[in-house]
Every structure is written in C-alpha cells, then in structure tokens.
Amino acid sequence: MKNKEMKTRTLWGRVAPYALAVVLCLALGWVASMLQREALAEWYPSLAKSPLTPPGIVFPLAWSALYVLIGIAFGAAWHASAESRGALLGWWGVQCVLNFLWSVSFFYARSPWAGMVVIVALLVAVVVFMVKSRRACRVAIGCFVPYLLWLAFAAYLNAYVCLYN
C-alpha cells in the first residue's frame, strides 16, 4: 500500500504544476475577457481593422488553446534543472503579466498605442523565455512557438489599428 501511495504522490507531484498553471492561465484569460467585454461591444467594432482580422469567434478559441500551452510550458519549466528553473519561471511570470496587461491597455483603457508598447514587450519576454529554455526545457519552447506566432500576428493587428484609427 505504501508503494502505491508513493507512486500516486510522485505522479501528482509531476502533474500538479502543469494542471495548476493551466487552470491559472485559463482563469487569467477569463478575467481579461471580462475586462474586455464592454470595449468589445461598444468601442472595438467602430475601429478600422486589418482585412486579415479573423472572425471574432477565433480569438477565444485560439487564446484558450494558447493558455493551455502556456500552462504546460510552466509545468515543463517547473521541472527543469535547479540552475535553470528560477530564470525560466521568472520570464514565464513576466510574459504572463504582460499578456494580461495587453488586454487591459488595448481594450479596457481603449489605447491601441499602449497595447502596442505592451505587445512588443510581451514578444521580447516570450523570445527571452524561449532562448533561456533552449537547453533546459525544450517542451516549453515547443509550447511557445504557436504562442509566439499568434503574438506576432496580434502585434500586426494592433499596429494596423494604431495606424488607421
């Protein structure tokens, strides 16, 4: 019985950082979406948007998938070597804060220019996280590739709104 209990505890110890981070990321995304709600209904429709802007339904679906990947990247970073873990988790936290601040600055504050500054900083933080992960945590890099591509596209959409409004 003790051996089975030990295996369960060990398995939970491996899985818990992934699960908790995914839940945290999805919760932060939900809070951000609540802050965006009014601007999405009243302000955003009046903006000139890029012809490449996807239909509205794409955004919550894409972000939900990305938040799961971001959470998995946290779990992978959590299990990285002790000498790498601190920097990886630090940069993961920085990108998380910037990700949330983009929604606040672009939608809640209704400031595309502030959003542009934040998304550029977010892109830098994601690239730094990926570079620091290259030896210690390849799973995190794999999780962040689609995130980086989506952020680059979002930066283009943000820049378009800045330039044409």
Label the model's feature ranges.
Residues V104-W113, Y160-N165:
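Membrane-interface helix caps and helix-loop-helix hairpins in membrane proteins
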Residues A48-L61:
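Short aromatic-rich membrane-water interface segments that cap or initiate transmembrane helices
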Residues K132, A136-N165:
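Terminal transmembrane helical module of multi-pass membrane proteins
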Residues T8-L35:
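N-terminal signal-anchor transmembrane alpha helix
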Residues E83-W92:
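Membrane-interfacial loop-to-transmembrane alpha-helix junctions, especially the N-terminal start
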Residues F106-P112, V127-I141:
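Membrane-helix boundary connector in multi-pass membrane proteins
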Residues E38-P51:
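Membrane-interface helix termini and inter-helical loops of multi-pass transporters
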Residues W63-F74, Q95-L98, L122:
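Core segments of transmembrane alpha-helices
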